[in-house]
Amino acid sequence: MKKVGFDNDKYLKLQSEHIRERIAKFGGKLYLEFGGKLFDDYHASRVLPGFKPDSKLQMLLQLKDDAEVVIAINSGDIEKNKIRGDLGITYDTDVLRLIAAFRGVGLYVGSVVLTQYAGQQTADHFAKRLEGIGIKVYKHHHVEGYPSNLQQILSEEGFGRNDYIETTRKLVIVTAPGPGSGKMATCLSQLYKDHQRGDVAGYAKFETFPIWNIPLKHPVNIAYEAATADLNDVNMIDPFHLDAYGVKAVNYNRDVEIFPVLNAMFERIFGESPYKSPTDMGVNMAGNCIVDDAVVCDASNQEIIRRYYQALCNDRQGRESKEEIYKLELLMNKVEITTADRKVVAAALSKADATGEPAAAIEFPDGEIITGKTSELLGASSAMLINALKKLAGIPDEALLISPEVIEPIQKLKTEHLGNRNPRLHTDEVLIALSICAVTNPTVQKAMNELHNLSGCEVHSSVILSHIDENVFKKLGINLTCEPKYQENKFYQN
């Protein structure tokens, strides 16, 4: 039974209601800067067990009749083919993906705004492509002195040069394929233009983390710092909120640093600022929906350890700086955890020591741990996967789900025809073999029926795994960590 620490239904209700209240506060028009992942927020679902990866999307669907989406993309990012690291696609391709995804669930995409536009040919080509599929395109220019030179920004030579984005709904969700796309500047430009036109509108910011109304050193907030260790974001007590209300609220350094500028900008536009602190600008209600703090703390601690192992492996592969590792070690010290608090680590390493070969271990939600060892036929991860499925299905450990007669021809194909040096079956190959065997073997089918129960389980490998195995675990929803070393000093896995 998976432990739940977050009430997702309560969140959907509270969050949508709170956004409606903010729309009403500003007379019926709100530009909502939407940070983080709108689709597939797996970080939130890991640290807040019970939070669904698509919760934010489901929440917005409750507002869809009043909402429209504006997607911002930096023209410079189009020019240099900037890649979204988690998906491996360019930012402009991701804009098309987002449009299709939003439309697919019934959200209205009003337009795309090309920010930092300076006549880039690639941006012009992209604009034509968007217009060809019926999407309105607007252009916002670089503003000299942004964000500190208010006189320049709030003038016809600043925001005045930007296109006014025509919107028709009460809630305008401004999102982007990644950071640095100009979401905030887009919102502020619209506020300036609306004010010039005599229209009333407001601004708010949606960020799930850090959670403002739980302690600064709460593991959920520390896990956010761990997730953004490469950005050097630091959680802090919002000094403006403390000064205005005498209440401690958590925010992060960039929002606190920019607030005096935003505040002055709001005063210039509205006559007085509607907000007394950066926390006031937010609409996040996630902290009100934590129902079991112990479960959430444990899940967040595990996330911090996972981030640490990921950084160690990235460093081993030459993709990480030592500073990020040091920061993660400091964060672990803050919440008083070590790698020993991840139980599967000791189990995997113990099995590896006993066999002298790579090993892997998986922990089920009830705390039970199953291991897998390397054999002539299977890699450790594949063996562990089979053992885990057998355990979940109540199949005796000695039962063979895939006979050697099935595995050996696959190995022959791999080594003699496909050029692989490693004959052992990867996890994807094992799953395909199991699927074929399940057609004629009800016992194997029984094991395959348990695949969905692997989601949320914890796995540790005594060596760095191949990208193939990593991707299989990711698709199964398994939380993987690896020791930062290769099998027998093999720097490339195939």
Which residue stretches match the model-derived regions?
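Short HxH-centered metal-ligating active-site micro-motif
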Residues: 391-423
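Residues at the beta-strand->loop junction immediately N-terminal to the Walker
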Residues: 175-177
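Residue-level structural signal for beta-strand termini and adjacent loop
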Residues: 202, 374-376
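Hydrophobic positions on the alpha1 helix immediately C-terminal to the Walker A/P-loop
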Residues: 186
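Hydrophobic "anchor" residues
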Residues: 369-370
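A short, polar/charged loop-to-alpha-helix boundary motif
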Residues: 377-393
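Flexible phosphate-sensing "switch/lid" loops adjacent to ATP/NTP-binding sites
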Residues: 1-173, 190-351, 357, 364-366, ...
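Walker A (P-loop) phosphate-binding loop of P-loop NTPases
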Residues: 179-181
